[in-house]
């Protein structure tokens, strides 16, 4: 019997038979801004398919990530990673906090993608944290911060091109990284997932919102939206 190690808002981690491997299961849960949890039937299956596909694509261009293989409709086998206590947010278009905090027009396109770091803590509501704080808190070394930024931008550039190819704009995405030790050396590795749960996706022509942004106002369209994204990616 699998031993549950951790349960988050939309995924559950279980132990695997081999050391340093885990099983990651995608659930149908979603959390609203109010903190209420809702179920979107079938969402976990679609996210497993989408994330598996995108992680495979990233592996092909040399991005080390924790994905090993898809086990079944909801589960995948992953490498154990010592996850950094930060999220890396990359934005190429004004949305969300850029509109609320800076008064920018939604949809304004930045000259270059902007990187933000947030503390990976729902309890503290994911506060923004800067590089100096990350360094002084001992969370990452200077070289690790540099490597994470370089990888994040490379990932974002690749995913943006891939989504444009299927008529979708990648407006923003949230990435997580960590360390995998190889003797005395460590490797920076992409972890978590890449799916409509952590990517802000819009129709490229109409700017119609897709994915998690529909949860609050049009929850009845969420599954249909995730399915559209999965179907478009099948074309690749």
UniProtKB/Swiss-Prot annotation:
CDD domains registered for this protein in UniProt: SAICAR_synt_PurC
Q: What class of enzyme is it?
A: ligase
Name the UniProt key words of this record, in alphabetical order.
Answer: ATP-binding, Ligase, Nucleotide-binding, Purine biosynthesis
Tell me which domain of life the UniProt entry assigns to the organism this sequence originates from.
Answer: Bacteria
Biological process according to GO: 'de novo' IMP biosynthetic process; cobalamin biosynthetic process
Q: In which pathway does it act?
A: Purine metabolism; IMP biosynthesis via de novo pathway; 5-amino-1-(5-phospho-D-ribosyl)imidazole-4-carboxamide from 5-amino-1-(5-phospho-D-ribosyl)imidazole-4-carboxylate: step 1/2
Covalent S-S links between cysteines: none
List the InterPro entries hit by this protein, alphabetically.
SAICAR_synt/ADE2_N, SAICAR_synt_PurC, SAICAR_synthetase
EC identifiers of the protein: 6.3.2.6
Instruction: Please provide one cellular component term from the Gene Ontology annotations of this protein.
Output: cytosol
UniProt record similarity statement:
Belongs to the SAICAR synthetase family.
State the protein's name. Phosphoribosylaminoimidazole-succinocarboxamide synthase
Q: Which gene encodes it?
A: purC
